[in-house]
Protein backbone atom coordinates (compact mmCIF):
# COMPACT_ATOMS: atom_id res chain seq x y z
CA UNK A 1 0.00 0.00 0.00
CA UNK A 2 1.29 3.48 -0.91
CA UNK A 3 1.96 5.84 1.95
CA UNK A 4 -0.95 8.33 2.35
CA UNK A 5 1.44 11.27 2.34
CA UNK A 6 2.59 10.23 -1.15
CA UNK A 7 -0.84 9.39 -2.59
CA UNK A 8 -3.30 11.93 -1.10
CA UNK A 9 -3.64 14.92 -3.51
CA UNK A 10 -3.15 17.53 -0.76
CA UNK A 11 -0.63 15.65 1.39
CA UNK A 12 1.40 14.96 -1.77
CA UNK A 13 2.02 18.70 -2.26
CA UNK A 14 3.14 19.13 1.37
CA UNK A 15 5.28 15.98 1.12
CA UNK A 16 7.06 17.14 -2.03
CA UNK A 17 7.68 20.61 -0.59
CA UNK A 18 8.66 19.89 3.04
CA UNK A 19 9.31 16.17 3.61
CA UNK A 20 10.74 14.22 0.66
CA UNK A 21 12.15 17.33 -1.05
CA UNK A 22 15.71 16.59 -2.25
CA UNK A 23 17.90 19.31 -0.71
CA UNK A 24 21.64 20.06 -1.07
CA UNK A 25 23.64 18.45 1.75
CA UNK A 26 25.76 21.55 2.42
CA UNK A 27 23.36 24.50 2.78
CA UNK A 28 24.39 26.68 5.73
CA UNK A 29 22.37 28.69 8.26
CA UNK A 30 22.03 31.46 5.65
CA UNK A 31 19.42 29.20 4.03
CA UNK A 32 17.30 29.32 7.21
CA UNK A 33 15.86 32.77 6.54
CA UNK A 34 13.25 31.58 4.02
CA UNK A 35 11.48 29.49 6.66
CA UNK A 36 11.97 32.26 9.24
CA UNK A 37 10.22 34.69 6.91
CA UNK A 38 7.31 32.26 6.65
CA UNK A 39 7.12 32.12 10.46
CA UNK A 40 7.30 35.93 10.66
CA UNK A 41 4.45 36.24 8.14
CA UNK A 42 2.20 33.79 10.02
CA UNK A 43 3.02 35.52 13.31
CA UNK A 44 2.20 38.95 11.83
CA UNK A 45 -1.10 37.71 10.36
CA UNK A 46 -2.17 36.14 13.68
CA UNK A 47 -1.18 39.07 15.93
CA UNK A 48 -2.60 41.50 13.34
CA UNK A 49 -5.91 39.66 13.28
CA UNK A 50 -6.31 39.98 17.06
CA UNK A 51 -5.29 43.65 16.94
CA UNK A 52 -7.86 44.31 14.18
CA UNK A 53 -10.59 42.98 16.50
CA UNK A 54 -10.02 45.94 18.83
CA UNK A 55 -8.67 48.63 16.49
CA UNK A 56 -10.83 51.37 14.95
CA UNK A 57 -9.68 53.02 11.71
CA UNK A 58 -11.13 56.45 12.44
CA UNK A 59 -8.98 59.55 13.00
CA UNK A 60 -10.83 60.45 16.20
CA UNK A 61 -10.49 57.02 17.84
CA UNK A 62 -7.49 55.24 16.21
CA UNK A 63 -4.90 56.48 18.74
CA UNK A 64 -7.23 55.78 21.68
CA UNK A 65 -8.04 52.29 20.37
CA UNK A 66 -4.32 51.38 20.36
CA UNK A 67 -4.01 52.71 23.93
CA UNK A 68 -7.12 50.68 24.83
CA UNK A 69 -5.51 47.52 23.36
CA UNK A 70 -2.40 48.06 25.50
CA UNK A 71 -4.24 48.93 28.72
CA UNK A 72 -7.59 47.15 28.77
CA UNK A 73 -7.47 44.14 26.45
CA UNK A 74 -6.22 40.89 28.04
CA UNK A 75 -2.60 40.51 26.92
CA UNK A 76 -3.24 43.27 24.37
CA UNK A 77 0.12 44.87 25.17
CA UNK A 78 2.06 41.72 24.24
CA UNK A 79 0.06 41.26 21.02
CA UNK A 80 0.68 44.88 20.04
CA UNK A 81 4.42 44.75 20.77
CA UNK A 82 4.84 41.35 19.12
CA UNK A 83 3.24 42.83 16.01
CA UNK A 84 5.35 46.01 16.06
CA UNK A 85 8.65 44.24 16.81
CA UNK A 86 7.65 41.29 14.61
CA UNK A 87 7.87 43.74 11.70
CA UNK A 88 11.47 44.53 12.69
CA UNK A 89 12.35 40.83 12.86
CA UNK A 90 10.62 40.38 9.48
CA UNK A 91 12.89 43.00 7.89
CA UNK A 92 16.04 41.66 9.56
CA UNK A 93 15.24 38.24 8.06
CA UNK A 94 14.35 39.83 4.69
CA UNK A 95 17.62 41.74 4.40
CA UNK A 96 19.63 38.66 5.48
CA UNK A 97 17.72 36.56 2.91
CA UNK A 98 18.40 39.06 0.10
CA UNK A 99 22.04 39.40 1.20
CA UNK A 100 22.43 35.62 1.05
CA UNK A 101 20.96 35.64 -2.47
CA UNK A 102 23.43 38.32 -3.57
CA UNK A 103 26.46 36.65 -2.00
CA UNK A 104 25.85 33.12 -3.25
CA UNK A 105 24.44 34.05 -6.67
CA UNK A 106 20.92 32.73 -6.02
CA UNK A 107 19.65 35.51 -8.32
CA UNK A 108 20.45 33.29 -11.31
CA UNK A 109 17.10 31.59 -10.60
CA UNK A 110 15.39 34.42 -12.49
CA UNK A 111 11.71 33.74 -11.73
CA UNK A 112 12.37 33.03 -8.04
CA UNK A 113 14.51 36.18 -7.72
CA UNK A 114 12.07 38.51 -9.51
CA UNK A 115 9.12 37.24 -7.47
CA UNK A 116 11.31 37.83 -4.41
CA UNK A 117 11.80 41.47 -5.47
CA UNK A 118 8.01 41.84 -5.85
CA UNK A 119 7.60 40.29 -2.38
CA UNK A 120 10.11 42.76 -0.91
CA UNK A 121 8.22 45.73 -2.41
CA UNK A 122 4.87 44.38 -1.17
CA UNK A 123 6.18 43.82 2.36
CA UNK A 124 7.63 47.35 2.38
CA UNK A 125 4.27 48.80 1.28
CA UNK A 126 2.46 46.78 3.96
CA UNK A 127 4.87 47.89 6.71
CA UNK A 128 4.57 51.54 5.65
CA UNK A 129 0.76 51.45 5.80
CA UNK A 130 0.86 49.62 9.14
CA UNK A 131 3.04 52.38 10.62
CA UNK A 132 0.32 54.93 9.77
CA UNK A 133 -2.43 53.08 11.68
CA UNK A 134 -1.63 54.05 15.33
CA UNK A 135 -2.19 57.68 14.21
CA UNK A 136 0.64 59.16 16.26
CA UNK A 137 2.68 62.18 15.16
CA UNK A 138 5.23 60.10 13.21
CA UNK A 139 2.41 58.02 11.65
CA UNK A 140 0.66 61.13 10.34
CA UNK A 141 3.73 63.03 9.18
CA UNK A 142 5.40 59.93 7.75
CA UNK A 143 2.26 59.26 5.68
CA UNK A 144 2.12 62.92 4.59
CA UNK A 145 5.78 63.13 3.55
CA UNK A 146 6.03 59.76 1.78
CA UNK A 147 2.71 59.95 -0.12
CA UNK A 148 3.54 63.56 -1.07
CA UNK A 149 6.61 62.29 -2.95
CA UNK A 150 4.29 61.04 -5.69
CA UNK A 151 3.43 64.68 -6.48
CA UNK A 152 6.91 64.85 -8.07
CA UNK A 153 5.61 62.71 -10.96
CA UNK A 154 5.12 65.13 -13.87
CA UNK A 155 1.60 66.06 -15.01
CA UNK A 156 -0.40 63.46 -13.01
CA UNK A 157 1.47 63.83 -9.68
CA UNK A 158 -0.90 66.14 -7.79
CA UNK A 159 -4.02 64.28 -8.92
CA UNK A 160 -2.41 60.97 -7.98
CA UNK A 161 -1.59 62.13 -4.44
CA UNK A 162 -5.11 63.51 -3.86
CA UNK A 163 -6.54 60.25 -5.21
CA UNK A 164 -4.44 58.21 -2.75
CA UNK A 165 -5.33 60.57 0.12
CA UNK A 166 -9.04 60.54 -0.72
CA UNK A 167 -9.06 64.30 -0.14
CA UNK A 168 -6.76 67.32 0.04
CA UNK A 169 -4.70 66.05 2.98
CA UNK A 170 -3.97 62.87 4.94
CA UNK A 171 -7.26 62.42 6.82
CA UNK A 172 -10.00 59.96 7.75
CA UNK A 173 -10.33 58.54 4.21
CA UNK A 174 -6.56 57.90 4.06
CA UNK A 175 -6.49 56.07 7.40
CA UNK A 176 -9.49 53.89 6.49
CA UNK A 177 -8.05 52.81 3.13
CA UNK A 178 -4.60 52.21 4.62
CA UNK A 179 -6.20 49.91 7.20
CA UNK A 180 -8.06 48.03 4.45
CA UNK A 181 -4.87 47.60 2.40
CA UNK A 182 -2.80 46.71 5.46
CA UNK A 183 -5.28 43.95 6.27
CA UNK A 184 -5.47 42.43 2.78
CA UNK A 185 -1.81 42.68 1.67
CA UNK A 186 -0.36 39.99 4.02
CA UNK A 187 -2.70 37.43 2.43
CA UNK A 188 -1.54 38.55 -1.01
CA UNK A 189 2.06 38.25 0.26
CA UNK A 190 1.28 34.70 1.40
CA UNK A 191 -0.01 33.82 -2.09
CA UNK A 192 3.04 35.35 -3.82
CA UNK A 193 5.33 33.52 -1.35
CA UNK A 194 3.76 30.23 -2.44
CA UNK A 195 4.54 31.08 -6.08
CA UNK A 196 8.09 32.03 -4.96
CA UNK A 197 8.42 28.55 -3.42
CA UNK A 198 6.86 26.89 -6.48
CA UNK A 199 9.50 28.40 -8.77
CA UNK A 200 12.28 27.55 -6.30
CA UNK A 201 11.21 23.89 -6.30
CA UNK A 202 11.36 23.85 -10.11
CA UNK A 203 15.15 24.27 -9.91
CA UNK A 204 15.99 23.18 -6.37
CA UNK A 205 18.02 25.20 -3.88
CA UNK A 206 21.37 26.81 -4.58
CA UNK A 207 24.22 26.03 -2.15
CA UNK A 208 27.28 27.92 -0.80
CA UNK A 209 29.61 26.66 -3.54
CA UNK A 210 27.27 27.70 -6.35
CA UNK A 211 27.98 24.33 -8.01
CA UNK A 212 25.17 21.92 -8.97
CA UNK A 213 24.32 19.66 -6.04
CA UNK A 214 22.34 17.08 -8.06
CA UNK A 215 24.93 14.41 -7.26
CA UNK A 216 24.57 14.90 -3.50
CA UNK A 217 21.03 15.42 -2.20
CA UNK A 218 19.49 14.60 1.19
CA UNK A 219 15.79 14.56 2.18
CA UNK A 220 14.48 17.81 3.66
CA UNK A 221 12.98 15.92 6.60
CA UNK A 222 14.44 15.30 9.20
CA UNK A 223 17.68 17.18 8.41
CA UNK A 224 16.39 20.61 7.49
CA UNK A 225 13.13 20.44 9.45
CA UNK A 226 15.14 20.17 12.68
CA UNK A 227 17.47 22.91 11.46
CA UNK A 228 14.48 25.17 10.71
CA UNK A 229 13.01 24.47 14.17
CA UNK A 230 16.29 25.60 15.76
CA UNK A 231 16.19 28.77 13.63
CA UNK A 232 12.56 29.37 14.62
CA UNK A 233 13.39 29.01 18.34
CA UNK A 234 16.23 31.53 18.02
CA UNK A 235 13.96 33.93 16.11
CA UNK A 236 11.23 33.69 18.76
CA UNK A 237 13.84 34.10 21.52
CA UNK A 238 15.17 37.29 19.88
CA UNK A 239 11.64 38.62 19.31
CA UNK A 240 10.50 37.93 22.88
CA UNK A 241 13.67 39.48 24.35
CA UNK A 242 12.82 42.61 22.38
CA UNK A 243 9.11 42.53 23.26
CA UNK A 244 9.54 41.83 26.98
CA UNK A 245 12.65 43.89 27.78
CA UNK A 246 12.80 46.75 25.27
CA UNK A 247 9.47 46.97 23.37
CA UNK A 248 10.01 50.61 22.33
CA UNK A 249 13.71 50.32 21.49
CA UNK A 250 13.13 50.45 17.72
CA UNK A 251 10.10 52.77 17.79
CA UNK A 252 9.87 56.56 17.76
CA UNK A 253 8.85 58.43 20.95
CA UNK A 254 6.94 60.92 18.75
CA UNK A 255 4.42 58.19 17.98
CA UNK A 256 3.18 58.36 21.58
CA UNK A 257 1.88 61.85 20.79
CA UNK A 258 -1.50 61.84 18.97
CA UNK A 259 -1.38 63.07 15.35
CA UNK A 260 -1.58 66.84 15.04
CA UNK A 261 -1.67 68.36 11.51
CA UNK A 262 -0.81 71.80 12.96
CA UNK A 263 2.44 70.72 14.63
CA UNK A 264 5.30 69.28 12.56
CA UNK A 265 7.85 67.13 14.49
CA UNK A 266 11.45 68.47 14.25
CA UNK A 267 12.77 65.27 12.61
CA UNK A 268 10.43 63.26 10.42
CA UNK A 269 11.86 59.81 9.83
CA UNK A 270 10.46 56.34 9.01
CA UNK A 271 11.06 53.12 10.94
CA UNK A 272 14.70 51.92 11.05
CA UNK A 273 14.24 49.41 8.24
CA UNK A 274 13.46 52.17 5.70
CA UNK A 275 16.21 54.58 6.79
CA UNK A 276 18.73 53.48 4.12
CA UNK A 277 16.22 54.28 1.33
CA UNK A 278 15.18 57.51 3.11
CA UNK A 279 18.85 58.60 3.25
CA UNK A 280 19.18 58.01 -0.53
CA UNK A 281 15.97 60.02 -1.09
CA UNK A 282 17.25 62.95 1.01
CA UNK A 283 20.73 62.97 -0.52
CA UNK A 284 19.40 64.40 -3.81
CA UNK A 285 18.33 68.07 -3.60
CA UNK A 286 15.79 67.69 -6.44
CA UNK A 287 12.37 66.23 -5.54
CA UNK A 288 11.84 64.11 -8.67
CA UNK A 289 15.49 63.02 -8.67
CA UNK A 290 15.16 61.91 -5.04
CA UNK A 291 12.00 59.92 -5.77
CA UNK A 292 13.66 58.20 -8.75
CA UNK A 293 16.76 57.38 -6.67
CA UNK A 294 14.52 56.00 -3.90
CA UNK A 295 12.62 53.76 -6.34
CA UNK A 296 15.78 52.66 -8.11
CA UNK A 297 17.55 51.83 -4.83
CA UNK A 298 15.13 48.90 -4.43
CA UNK A 299 14.35 48.13 -8.10
CA UNK A 300 18.10 47.83 -8.79
CA UNK A 301 17.77 44.33 -7.31
CA UNK A 302 15.90 43.27 -10.45
CA UNK A 303 18.98 44.25 -12.51
CA UNK A 304 21.42 42.15 -10.45
CA UNK A 305 21.16 39.01 -12.67
CA UNK A 306 22.01 41.14 -15.74
CA UNK A 307 25.07 42.59 -13.99
CA UNK A 308 26.58 39.17 -13.20
CA UNK A 309 29.83 38.94 -15.16
CA UNK A 310 31.70 36.19 -13.30
CA UNK A 311 32.04 32.66 -14.66
CA UNK A 312 31.45 31.46 -11.10
CA UNK A 313 28.04 31.69 -9.52
CA UNK A 314 28.86 32.12 -5.83
CA UNK A 315 31.24 34.61 -4.19
CA UNK A 316 32.64 31.77 -2.04
CA UNK A 317 35.85 31.58 -4.10
CA UNK A 318 35.99 35.24 -5.22
CA UNK A 319 37.84 37.36 -2.60
CA UNK A 320 37.66 40.60 -4.62
CA UNK A 321 33.87 40.37 -4.97
CA UNK A 322 33.62 39.43 -1.29
CA UNK A 323 35.39 42.67 -0.30
CA UNK A 324 32.97 44.68 -2.44
CA UNK A 325 29.97 42.80 -1.04
CA UNK A 326 30.95 43.63 2.54
CA UNK A 327 31.69 47.22 1.46
CA UNK A 328 28.07 47.31 0.22
CA UNK A 329 26.83 46.00 3.58
CA UNK A 330 28.90 48.66 5.42
CA UNK A 331 27.56 51.30 3.02
CA UNK A 332 23.94 50.26 3.73
CA UNK A 333 24.61 50.44 7.49
CA UNK A 334 26.09 53.93 6.98
CA UNK A 335 22.99 54.98 5.00
CA UNK A 336 20.75 53.58 7.77
CA UNK A 337 22.62 55.69 10.33
CA UNK A 338 22.47 58.82 8.12
CA UNK A 339 18.72 58.40 7.51
CA UNK A 340 18.11 58.84 11.24
CA UNK A 341 20.26 61.99 11.53
CA UNK A 342 19.11 65.61 11.05
CA UNK A 343 19.71 67.29 7.67
CA UNK A 344 22.85 69.26 8.53
CA UNK A 345 26.62 69.21 7.99
CA UNK A 346 28.42 66.71 7.97
CA UNK A 347 25.50 64.25 7.60
CA UNK A 348 24.40 65.68 4.23
CA UNK A 349 27.82 65.06 2.64
CA UNK A 350 28.20 61.59 4.21
CA UNK A 351 24.71 60.67 2.93
CA UNK A 352 25.52 61.86 -0.59
CA UNK A 353 28.82 59.96 -0.68
CA UNK A 354 27.20 56.78 0.69
CA UNK A 355 24.36 57.06 -1.87
CA UNK A 356 26.80 57.45 -4.79
CA UNK A 357 28.89 54.54 -3.45
CA UNK A 358 25.77 52.33 -3.19
CA UNK A 359 24.95 52.67 -6.90
CA UNK A 360 28.63 52.64 -7.90
CA UNK A 361 29.26 49.34 -6.09
CA UNK A 362 26.27 47.57 -7.64
CA UNK A 363 26.37 49.00 -11.16
CA UNK A 364 30.12 49.39 -11.77
CA UNK A 365 32.51 47.93 -9.21
CA UNK A 366 30.96 44.49 -8.64
CA UNK A 367 30.54 43.64 -12.37
CA UNK A 368 34.12 44.89 -12.97
CA UNK A 369 35.42 42.70 -10.13
CA UNK A 370 33.70 39.70 -11.73
CA UNK A 371 35.46 40.38 -15.04
CA UNK A 372 38.86 40.88 -13.32
CA UNK A 373 38.46 37.59 -11.44
CA UNK A 374 37.70 35.79 -14.73
CA UNK A 375 40.91 37.26 -16.22
CA UNK A 376 42.97 36.25 -13.16
CA UNK A 377 41.75 32.67 -13.57
CA UNK A 378 42.44 32.85 -17.35
CA UNK A 379 38.76 32.10 -18.10
From Swiss-Prot:
Positions annotated to bind a ubiquinone: 201
Cofactor note: Binds 2 heme b groups non-covalently.
TM annotation in the entry: 33-53, 77-98, 113-133, 178-198, 226-246, 288-308, 320-340, 347-367
Annotated positions binding heme b b562: 83, 182
GO molecular function terms attached to this record: heme binding; metal ion binding; ubiquinol-cytochrome-c reductase activity; ubiquinone binding
Cofactor: heme b
GO CC term, one of those recorded: membrane
GO biological process, one term: respiratory electron transport chain
Primary location class: mitochondrion
InterPro entries, per database record: Cyt_b/b6_C, Cyt_b/b6_C_sf, Cyt_b/b6_N, Cytb/b6-like_sf, Cytochrome_b, Cytochrome_b_C_euk/bac, Cytochrome_b_N_euk/bac, Di-haem_cyt_TM
Tissue expression summary: Detected in heart (at protein level).
Outcome following mutation: residue 90 to V: In strain: 65, 66 and D
Gene3D superfamilies according to UniProt: Cytochrome Bc1 Complex, Chain C
Keyword Transmembrane: yes
Alphabetical keyword list: Electron transport, Heme, Iron, Membrane, Metal-binding, Mitochondrion, Mitochondrion inner membrane, Respiratory chain, Transmembrane, Transmembrane helix, Transport, Ubiquinone
Compartments it resides in: Mitochondrion inner membrane
Miscellaneous section: Heme 1 (or BL or b562) is low-potential and absorbs at about 562 nm, and heme 2 (or BH or b566) is high-potential and absorbs at about 566 nm.
Oligomeric form and interacting partners: The cytochrome bc1 complex contains 11 subunits: 3 respiratory subunits (MT-CYB, CYC1 and UQCRFS1), 2 core proteins (UQCRC1 and UQCRC2) and 6 low-molecular weight proteins (UQCRH/QCR6, UQCRB/QCR7, UQCRQ/QCR8, UQCR10/QCR9, UQCR11/QCR10 and a cleavage product of UQCRFS1). This cytochrome bc1 complex then forms a dimer.
Function: Component of the ubiquinol-cytochrome c reductase complex (complex III or cytochrome b-c1 complex) that is part of the mitochondrial respiratory chain. The b-c1 complex mediates electron transfer from ubiquinol to cytochrome c. Contributes to the generation of a proton gradient across the mitochondrial membrane that is then used for ATP synthesis.
Family to which this protein belongs: Belongs to the cytochrome b family.
Protein name, per record: Cytochrome b
UniProt organism field: Bos taurus (Bovine)
Encoding gene (name): MT-CYB
